[in-house]
Regions:
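C-terminal motif of bacterial Sec signal peptides marking the signal peptidase cleavage site
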Residues: 19-22
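Bacterial N-terminal signal peptides that target proteins for export
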Residues: 1-9
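Short beta-strand-centered segments that line the small-molecule binding cleft or hinge
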Residues: 129
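Repetitive helical segments and hydrophobic/amphipathic motifs
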Residues: 15-16
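Generic detector of short alpha-helix boundary/capping microenvironments
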Residues: 11-12, 136
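Intrinsically disordered and other compositionally biased segments
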Residues: 9-11, 296
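N-terminal secretory/targeting leader peptides
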Residues: 24-126, 135, 142-295
Length: 297
């Protein structure tokens, strides 16, 4: 499978080089009018997600703002690799663009763990205000820059919430519940502090785990709960809102620096528009949910 992905990627890169190798001269400008291959953007998320909406809107805006001379193709569902592979390929310049949750990035950029501190924010508007703050954004851009990426912005899928078959009304109701978490020490420490029993598990095993009773509960943003039909195995959503589920849009620093100033500006403007659009879509999706009981402990 990895060899297959490498072959696919090599084909993308060959085309990308044809377009990007001569940026800045007249021949390249003429060539750009008939860009033969689109730059790949990789994601590990399924199609029907805000992550995909974010990626597709970005690609659409890049094409619109460049009058069709800059093209990006979005590849979801880990077609170009899982989260770790995408980050590695992006850093090496093999996959120019990646859209993904910030949690997998902590291994590469430990300071990104700032988003793993639980119960810091009360509303998603407060989260957005902070991540858009010029000073904070500048610091995070430096973190990504030091690692070989250019951070173009953060959208989100709202907060992460808990699903369970227990009607949680107080802190004591968390006690003993086996809850699936990502393999993240900060996440696990939070649930331990509440008295629950955090159980790291790959996401592909969550539905079966709930069905077979291997785990009692899990935590994810609403959209993931709905798109993966976890409500079929769970009766309650507990609005813990313990962490914002942030989605980053990044580009390889090496690739970005090889573009003209005009192209870079188009990419930044497209990213800003896509970010705002993705946030609107996230809010609308969350507001439309009515599949399971919601409790607020």
């Amino acid at each position: 499978m990895k060899n297959c992905k490498k072959k696919i990627l090599c084909g993308f890169l060959a085309g990308a080089v044809l377009f990007a190798s001569g940026c800045g001269n007249k021949d390249t400008q003429d060539q750009a009018k008939v860009q033969r291959y689109a730059w790949p953007l990789g994601s590990s998320s399924p199609e029907d997600t805000v992550t995909q909406i974010y990626a597709e809107k970005f690609a659409e805006e890049v094409e619109r703002l460049s009058d069709g001379t800059m093209l990006i193709s979005v590849y979801p569902n880990s077609v170009l690799g899982g989260d770790r592979e995408l980050l590695e390929s992006c850093k090496e310049g093999d996959i120019p663009f990646v859209v993904q949750n910030t949690a997998p990035q902590v291994t590469f950029m430990p300071d990104v763990a700032v988003f793993d501190m639980p119960a810091v924010f009360e509303t998603i508007d407060e989260v957005r205000e902070h991540v858009d703050n010029p000073d904070f954004l500048s610091m995070m851009q430096q973190v990504y820059g030091d690692a070989g990426y250019v951070l173009l912005g953060y959208a989100d899928q709202g907060f992460r919430v808990m699903t369970t078959n227990r009607n949680v009304q107080s802190i004591s109701d968390f006690k003993g519940q086996k809850i699936r978490t990502m393999e993240n020490s900060y996440h696990m420490a939070y649930w331990k502090a509440l008295g629950a029993s955090p159980t790291p598990m790959t996401f592909s095993e969550v539905y079966i785990g709930l069905q077979q009773g291997t785990i009692d509960a899990q935590e994810n943003p609403y959209e993931v709960i709905v798109s993966n039909k976890l409500y079929e195995q769970q009766d309650y959503v507990v609005e813990t809102n313990h962490l914002p589920h942030l989605i980053s849009l990044i580009v390889s620093d090496e690739f970005f620096e090889g573009l003209t100033g005009e192209q870079q500006e188009i990419i930044r403007e497209a990213a800003e528009t896509a970010k705002e659009y993705a946030r609107e879509q996230s809010d609308e999706r969350i507001a439309s949910l009515s599949l399971i009981h919601i409790s607020e402990p």
